[in-house]
Design a protein with these regions (language model features):
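Short terminal (N- or C-terminal) low-complexity/amphipathic segments
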Residues: 34-36, 60, 65
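Stable alpha-helical structural segments in soluble proteins, enriched in small hydrophobic residues
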Residues: 63, 67-75
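Residue-level signature of catalytic and energy-coupling elements of molecular machines
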Residues: 5, 41, 64
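Residues at secondary-structure transition points
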Residues: 54-62, 78
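Long amphipathic alpha-helical segments used for membrane anchoring, targeting, substrate engagement
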Residues: 1-21, 25, 74-94
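Alpha-helix boundary/capping detector
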Residues: 31-34, 45, 67, 90-94
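A short acidic/small-residue loop/turn micro-motif
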Residues: 50-52
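N-terminal intrinsically disordered, cationic/polar leader segments
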Residues: 27-46, 55
Length: 94
């Protein structure tokens, strides 16, 4: 049983490493604001299209929040799927 637990822990750790290599993209305003994030929910980059124009600071902040939340939702989905795959066969409640 300990060996099985160690194998499962190893799979989870490998999955965490793999999630650092998976990226998702969140966007706002038809792609004029883009945020790239890893499957582990770490922001890699934020891009603002130079043609965005016409937005004040508060509107731009709102667009950044929208793009961030979009990326977070996608990263959470990827993370959940990867962790489910890694924990397949685990004993429930462990």
């Amino acid at each position: 049983m300990m060996k099985k637990l160690q194998e499962m822990q190893q799979k989870v750790e490998e999955t965490k490493v793999r999630l650092d290599t998976i990226t998702v993209e969140g966007t706002a305003s038809n792609g004029k604001v883009t945020l790239i994030m890893t499957g582990n929910r770490k922001v890699n980059s934020i891009s603002i299209n130079e043609k965005l124009g016409g937005f004040d600071r508060e509107e731009l902040e709102d667009l950044l929040i929208i793009a961030t939340n979009d990326a977070l939702e996608k990263a959470e989905s990827v993370n959940e799927l990867e962790m489910k795959a890694a924990s397949a066969g685990m004993i429930p409640g462990m």
